[in-house]
Amino acid sequence: MATAALLRSLRRREFATSSISAYRTLASNTKPSWCPSLVGAKWAGLARPFSSKPAGNEIIGIDLGTTNSCVAVMEGKNPKVIENSEGARTTPSVVAFNQKGELLVGTPAKRQAVTNPTNTLSGTKRLIGRRFDDPQTQKEMKMVPYKIVRGSNGDAWVEANGQQYSPTQIGAFILTKMKETAEAYLGKSINKAVITVPAYFNDAQRQAIKDAGAIAGLDVQRIINEPTAAALSYGMNSKEGLVAVFDLGGGTFDVSILEISNGVFEVKATNGDTFLGGEDFDNALLEFLVSEFKRTEGIDLSKDKLALQRLREAAEKAKIELSSTSQTDINLPFITADASGAKHLNITLTRSKFETLVNHLIERTRNPCKNCLKDAGVSLKDVDEVLLVGGMTRVPKVQEIVSEIFGKSPSKGVNPDEAVAMGAALQGGILRGDVKELLLLDVTPLARGIETLGGIFTRLINRNTTIPTKKSQVFSTAADNQTQVGIKVLQGEREMASDNKLLGEFDLVGIPPAPKGYCPQIEVIFDIDANGMVTVSAKDKATSKEQQITIRSSGGLSEDEIDKMVREAEMHAQRIKNARHLLISGIVQSTTIYSIEKSLSEYKEKVPKEVVTEIETAISDLRAAMGTENIDDIKAKLDAANKAVSKIGEHMAGGSSGGASGGGGAQGGDQPPEAEYEEVKK
C-alpha cells in the first residue's frame, strides 16, 4: 500500500509551456500562454493572466482617460466594470520605465513617481495628435517633470530613459493594461474594443487613438465621444428626454446635448475644450504651493523635479479632500534643504482659497455650454436633466457653476468615473447585435471644408452634423489652363483657411487645360464615418480622374512606425511574461525540491547509492538554474529532477513486488491483493 502511495506521489509531473505567438499583431487575436499544470488552485490567481484562453468575440468598452482609465464588458444586457489586478475599478493612466528599463503601467507606475519623476509619464493624452510647436504643447512642457520633445514628424513626443515615445505609444501601453484586465476576468483573449475620446477631439487625435488600439493588438470597432457614451449608460434603463452631459475630466472638457426617445440617442450638439481638466486644477494649486514656499522660505522649488513631483501629488490629494471637507493640511517634510538644514512645507488650505485659485478654470466651462445650447436650438427650460461625468465634477464649486448655467441641480444618476466605459461597452453590445433596442446618432464637433480662392474656408460639412454623413460640392479652377488642383482639407469654425486646422492636403492632376472657372468641374466629396474620421476625394467630371485621402494628421504615425511600435509592445509584453513566468516557475521549483528532498530523506537507505547521487545532483542543478532567467534551462533541469526521483518509486516497486510474493507463500495466500488506484483528473 505504501509503495503504491509513493508511486502515485512521485508520478512524473508535467511542466508544460505552450509556444509563444505574436503578442501584438494587428490581425492576431492570440495571446501568449503559459500554464504549469503543477500549480494548484492556491496559485491559480498568479497563473491566470498567462493561461491558455480561447479566442473571445466580446467587444470591450474602454475609457482611455487623461488621469484614469476604465474597462467594461457586457454581461447579458448590462455593462459591467472590470476590476484590475490591484482590485481597483479604475487604473491610473500612468506609464513609467524604471532603471532596468522595465515597463510599469497603472498603480505600480504611479507609486514610484516621486523617486523617478523624469521617467514617469502621466497626462500624455493631452499631447495626442498635437504638434510640438502647438502653443498648448509649449505650455504643457513647463508643467510636467518629464521631457516633451519634437518627434521626427514634428509631433509632440515624450522621452524616458533616453528613449523617445509617441503619446500614441504611451496610450497603447495603457490600452494593453485594459485589454489584459478584461482577458483575466473573461478568461478569453480579446481583440475588439470600442474606445471613447473627448467629443472635441479632431481627426488627427481620433486617428491617433485608433493607432494606439492597433499597437495594443485591438481592432477598434468604433470611436465614440465620451459624453455620448455617458448618456448611453444613463439612458439604458428607458429614461427619456433632453439631456445635457457636462463632462469635466482629468485633461479635457466636453458638453453635449442629447435627445433620448424610444431607445434612440440623438446628439443635438457638442462643444468643449481639449485642454481644460483636472491637470490644470492641479497645476494651479502646484503654482500656489511653489509661490508660498518661496515667500516663506526664500527657496524656489520650480526647478527641483523631485520636489515638484511631491508637490504635484500633494496638490491632487488636497483637491480630492476639499471636495468633502472645508480645509486640509498639506505637510511635506524634508521637501528641500539649504545651508541652515532641512526645510519642511506645512500649509493649511481652505476650500474657499482653492476655489479662488481655480475659479478662472471653472469659468471657462460657461461659454462652451452656452454655445452648445445655441447650436442645439434649445433653451434652458427644454433641458430635462443635467448629467455630471468626470472626476472633476465632484468639486462643489463645479456643481454650483453647473447649476447656475443650466438653472437646475445636476443629476447624480451615473458614476462619473465609470459611466463612460459602461457606455462604450453598451456600444460594443449594439455593434455585436446583443443590444438591439438602442441606437446612437452622434455628430461631428467641428466644420470640415477646403481652402478656396482668396484663402477662404469653404465649409462642406457644418459642425454638429449627424454622422455618418457624405456631402459633395462642385468647384472649378482659379487660373487659366490649370492642369492641377491642390486640395487643402481643413477643420474649424474660422472664416479664413489659415486660422483653421489643416488636416491634410493632396493634388488632383491631369485636368484638361481650359479657361478658369469655365469648363473644369471638380467634385469634392467629404465622407465622415461613424468614428468621426473623414475621407476626402476630388474628381474631375470631364476625365473621371479621381484622387482621395483618408485624413490621418499633418504628422501622425506612418504604417512603418506603427509596425515598429507593435514590435516594441511585443518585447515589453515578453519581458513582463517572462517575469511572471519566472515567479510562478519559482513556486513550482520550490515545491518540487521540497517534495523530492522529503522523499529522498525517507527512502535514502532503501535505494542504490547511484540513484541517491543522481537525485542530489539533479536538485543541485535545479537550484542553480533557479538563479537564472533562462526558462528553457529551468524546465530542462526540472524535468531531470522529476526523472531522477521517479527511480525511487521504480526500485521500491521492484522490491515490494518480490517481497509480496514471498510473503504470500508464508501466509498461505490468505492476504488480499493490494488495490490498484487510478488517478482521476478533475
Swiss-Prot record:
Q: What is its main location?
A: mitochondrion
Q: Tell me if Mitochondrion is a UniProt keyword of this record.
A: yes
Locations listed in the record: Mitochondrion
GO CC aspect terms: cytoplasm; mitochondrion
- Transit peptide location on this chain: 1-57
What Pfam families has UniProt attached to this entry? HSP70 (PF00012)
Molecular function in Gene Ontology: ATP binding; ATP hydrolysis activity; ATP-dependent protein folding chaperone; heat shock protein binding; protein folding chaperone; unfolded protein binding
Q: Where is the composition biased (Gly residues)?
A: 655-668
The answer, when asked if Mitochondrion is one of the entry's keywords, is: yes
Q: Which SUPFAM superfamilies match?
A: Actin-like ATPase domain, Heat shock protein 70kD (HSP70), C-terminal subdomain, Heat shock protein 70kD (HSP70), peptide-binding domain
Q: Name one GO biological process term.
A: iron-sulfur cluster assembly
What family classification does the UniProt entry report for this protein?
Answer: Belongs to the heat shock protein 70 family.
Any idea what this protein is called? Heat shock 70 kDa protein, mitochondrial
Q: Which organism is it from?
A: Solanum tuberosum
Q: What is the lineage of its organism?
A: Eukaryota, Viridiplantae, Streptophyta, Embryophyta, Tracheophyta
Gene behind this protein? HSP68
